[in-house]
């Protein structure tokens, strides 16, 4: 259920981002627009990765393979590190004083969604580590 909510929120953010067209010579605004667009795209890819890992987790529960468990943990570590790095960039951008309300909302939304996704990935990683393998 929460995946559907997050997916709807990402879709809404992407629709809002597409409607907002920056001025032709406003490079800072264009950078903000592209950064949010990339962040939303990365969050969406992270959600798809989480769904894919859920299928791998189901397979791990059936097979109890040590190799598959290690592979899943490595993938989760990489995705979590990428999200944490993106959160740092979003935090730096939120400290800017020249953001308008829409830009601030977009940055805060991307930051909140990335925190939710990171929490879900950490929970999944703990589930994988708790599985006894052969």
From Swiss-Prot:
Write the signal peptide boundaries.
1-17
- Spell out the coiled coil positions from the record: 18-113
Q: Which proteins does it associate with, and in what oligomeric form?
A: May exist as homodimer and homotrimer.
Taxonomic superkingdom:
Eukaryota
- What is the reported tissue distribution? Midgut and hindgut contents as well as fecal pellets (at protein level).
Entry protein name: Mite allergen Blo t 5
Task: Give the keywords, sorted.
Answer: Allergen, Coiled coil, Signal
The Gene Ontology terms for molecular function here are: protein homodimerization activity
Q: Which family does it belong to?
A: Belongs to the mite group 5 allergen family.
| Gene Ontology biological-process entries | protein homotrimerization
């Amino acid at each position: 259920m929460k995946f559907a909510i997050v997916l709807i929120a990402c879709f809404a953010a992407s629709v809002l981002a597409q409607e907002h067209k920056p001025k032709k010579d406003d490079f800072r605004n264009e950078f903000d627009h592209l950064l949010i667009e990339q962040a939303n795209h990365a969050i969406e890819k992270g959600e798809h990765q989480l769904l894919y890992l859920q299928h791998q987790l189901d397979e791990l529960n059936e097979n109890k393979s040590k190799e598959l468990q290690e592979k899943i943990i490595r993938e989760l570590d990489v995705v979590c590190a990428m999200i944490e790095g993106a959160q740092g960039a979003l935090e730096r951008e939120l400290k800017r004083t020249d953001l308008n309300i829409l830009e601030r909302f977009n940055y805060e939304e991307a930051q909140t969604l990335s925190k939710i996704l990171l929490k879900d990935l950490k929970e999944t990683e703990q589930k994988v580590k708790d599985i006894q393998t052969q």
